[in-house]
Amino acid sequence: MRKAVCPGSFDPVTNGHLDIISRAAALYDEVTVAVLVNKAKRALFSVEERMDMVREATAQYPNVVVESFSGLLVDFCRARGIPVIIKGLRAVSDFDYELQMAQMNHSLAGVETLFLSTNPLYSFLSSSLVKEVAAYGGDVSTLIPDSVARRLRTRLFDPSREPDH
């Protein structure tokens, strides 16, 4: 079975993420979406909420599974027998950082990295940008799935709905 992982914080998952995940699902027998647990970074959504959003958004792909991870991604890969990391590249600036990470991951554990160029429709898109625009009342409906947009509006405009960290 050919396996790959698509890692990220997915806070929240965007249509750009989903483009990469769907393309990975077409290339591999099993794609694990690995949602990062980073206690040093304050996320808008808890890891459980982010995993739920990714599961909802990828429900049409039977070969996509969603898990969380902390620590080194290569340790996560090694424990699950995943030999390939899939990363989307939006711009040359992404490549500079991701190439270093790919080389380190290969050096540490022999894990390969496959770079997919982002669909030009999403080349500017990031979770941070979505959150910022939404916080100011901007329309992000074409950038994220509807279910994510509903959760985002609730989180941003209903202060009683803090994440469970």
Swiss-Prot record:
Top EC class for this record: transferase
GO cellular component, one term: cytoplasm
Binding site for ATP: S9, F10, H17, G88, L89, R90, E98, Y122, S123, F124, L125, S126, S127, S128
Binding site for substrate: S9, K41, L73, K87
Location of the protein in the cell: Cytoplasm
Site (Transition state stabilizer): H17
Protein role: Reversibly transfers an adenylyl group from ATP to 4'-phosphopantetheine, yielding dephospho-CoA (dPCoA) and pyrophosphate.
Family: Belongs to the bacterial CoaD family.
Protein name: Phosphopantetheine adenylyltransferase
